[in-house]
């Protein structure tokens, strides 16, 4: 294989795997957000409130990107028996992303008003619910890969192997 062919294959594989690559960053950031927010609620003077804002914003941007890439990557499976299983995963993913977008908007408004809600129990509850939705998204996404072989090379259901 020439380096041009290898590069072309690498680019094609990366585009095909984009969703799988993108999902792990927002998962890590938003789960960490839940832990740090709990710490801030328990220790209000910890100085970590700004850290939770950064985790929320970057994690939410990543979640939106991962959700969009997931919607795009599911199109080849529209007419397959796996469509229902994929829709279940999509529902959890869209719900988690929507909740974190709403939390980001809520917190942004509260910060502009000079009273950051990021250290409140109510904000922690919202983040905890979002983390639960994110966990369900991850579990159903894992099922797609490990139980159904979605996007696993050599076992791709679209190829009949």
Question: What residues fall within each predicted segment?
Answer:
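Polytopic transmembrane helical bundles with strong interfacial aromatic enrichment
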Residues: 1-161
């Amino acid at each position: 294989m020439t380096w041009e062919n290898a590069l072309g294959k690498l680019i094609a594989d990366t585009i095909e795997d984009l969703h799988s690559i993108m999902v792990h960053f927002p998962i890590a950031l938003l789960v960490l957000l839940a832990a740090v927010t709990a710490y801030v609620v328990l220790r209000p003077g910890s100085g970590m409130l700004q850290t939770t804002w950064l985790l929320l914003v970057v994690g939410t941007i990543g979640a939106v990107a991962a959700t969009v890439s997931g919607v795009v990557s599911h199109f080849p499976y529209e007419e397959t028996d796996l469509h229902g299983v994929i829709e279940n995963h999509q529902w959890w993913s869209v719900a988690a992303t929507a909740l974190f977008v709403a939390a980001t908007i809520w917190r942004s408004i509260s910060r502009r008003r000079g009273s950051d809600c990021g250290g409140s129990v109510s904000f922690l509850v919202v983040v905890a619910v979002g983390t639960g939705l994110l966990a369900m998204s991850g579990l159903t996404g894992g099922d797609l890969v490990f139980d159904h072989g979605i996007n696993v090379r050599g076992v791709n259901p679209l190829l009949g192997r």
